[in-house]
């Protein structure tokens, strides 16, 4: 039987992985890394997150305090001496500070703490796979391109945010410092929503689309494409990578790819249909960031009470990503047997429904923690 050390199970993607494993009743001994003062509190945090996924109480009862590994990747020395780690056969490392803000913990957790964790796991004799969750955006893609997986590291690459720089750096450091570790890197594209639950588990990034359409202007064109996948599809792929006996490659995109990426015009139409409104369509204008800054005093009229400075920062960051117009090749994961991903527009109605009544300001908090 596998012994899985799963990090990030109190978050969106890690929660989706645990959801899949519990629903499918997979034969796994769980060891869940959780930040908490004690094991009971850690268990409560896991259960609270899993309730967002509508997990049945009977399934959830399979997770007990024996499955809790108290610890924090910002202080890895506190948990790396736990004897249970020596029995781990598989790791899925979803934990990260995935903030697009200037969180001081980004480097401490995503690079320093994760490296210490990897170096400890590299010493475990029975470890069969260390599946590290990176991000497809860590490669600083060329605008307008279809990006293939590459393990090459560009030290002087330009990154839009510190988060993607940290994810690129840790991949390289783990390869250098843990050459014998059975490392596989999964790079999801942009994870938004859940095919069955919409944004109930997390509103991360979905609010950006609503913000742009409420503004009726943004930095990208409606003809630009964006590579979006739902959390449950990403979790399916991660579990498949964990369970595969042999893997031909060490880096896999989990992405919509060329075929399932969608244009902003398609998103506009799908959101309008879900809201039973007319799409923005021809009233949309592609503008520069400076033009958005000039609208600063209008933001409260458009969005209601909001932090204008934070809204403008969000527009600059997400507008820059949207303008990249990139898709990430998913041929390798499809070749392994993953089904084609759903298109964002196939499940966007559930995202709209699950965020009704929530302001943009309320929805965006998760991404600027």
Q: Where in this protein do the model-derived segments appear?
A:
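Amphipathic terminal alpha-helices
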Residues: 34, 316-319, 323-369
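Conserved Rossmann-fold NAD(P)-dependent oxidoreductase catalytic core, especially the SDR/UDP-sugar
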Residues: 93, 101-108, 112-165
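Active-site Tyr-X1-5-Lys
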Residues: 157-187
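Mid/C-terminal beta-alpha module of Rossmann-like enzyme folds, strongest
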Residues: 241-316, 335, 355-369
């Amino acid at each position: 039987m596998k012994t899985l050390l799963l990090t990030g199970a109190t978050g969106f993607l890690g929660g989706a992985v645990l959801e899949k494993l519990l629903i499918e009743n997979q034969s796994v001994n769980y060891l869940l890394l959780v930040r908490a003062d004690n094991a009971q509190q850690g268990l409560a945090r896991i259960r609270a997150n899993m309730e967002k996924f509508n997990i049945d109480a009977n399934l959830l009862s399979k997770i007990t305090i024996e499955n809790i590994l108290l610890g924090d990747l910002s202080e890895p020395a506190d948990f790396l001496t736990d004897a249970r780690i020596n029995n781990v056969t598989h790791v899925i490392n979803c934990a990260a500070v995935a903030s697009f803000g200037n969180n001081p913990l980004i480097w401490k957790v995503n690079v320093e703490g994760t490296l210490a964790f990897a170096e400890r796991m590299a010493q475990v004799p029975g470890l069969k796979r260390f599946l590290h969750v990176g991000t497809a955006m860590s490669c600083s893609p060329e605008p307008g391109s279809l990006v293939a997986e590459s393990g090459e590291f560009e030290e002087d690459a330009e990154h839009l945010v510190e988060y993607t720089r940290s994810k690129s750096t840790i991949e390289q450091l783990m390869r250098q410092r843990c050459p014998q570790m059975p490392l596989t890197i999964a790079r999801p594209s942009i994870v938004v929503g859940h095919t069955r639950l919409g944004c109930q588990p997390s509103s991360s990034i979905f609010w950006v689309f609503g913000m742009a359409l409420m503004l009726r202007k943004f930095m990208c064109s409606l003809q630009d494409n964006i590579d979006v996948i739902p959390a449950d599809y990403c979790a399916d792929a991660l579990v498949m990578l964990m369970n595969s006996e042999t893997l031909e490659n060490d880096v896999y995109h989990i992405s919509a790819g060329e075929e399932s990426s969608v244009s902003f015009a398609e998103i506009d139409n799908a959101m309008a249909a879900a809201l039973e409104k007319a799409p923005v369509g021809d009233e949309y204008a592609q503008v520069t960031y400076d033009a958005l800054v000039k609208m600063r005093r209008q933001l409260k009229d458009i969005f209601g009470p909001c932090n204008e400075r934070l809204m403008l920062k969000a527009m600059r960051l997400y507008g820059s990503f949207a303008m990249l117009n990139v898709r990430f090749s998913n041929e390798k994961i499809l070749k392994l047997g993953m089904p084609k991903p759903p298109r964002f527009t196939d499940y966007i109605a559930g995202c709209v429904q699950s965020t009704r009544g929530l302001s943009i300001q309320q929805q965006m908090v998760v991404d600027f923690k």
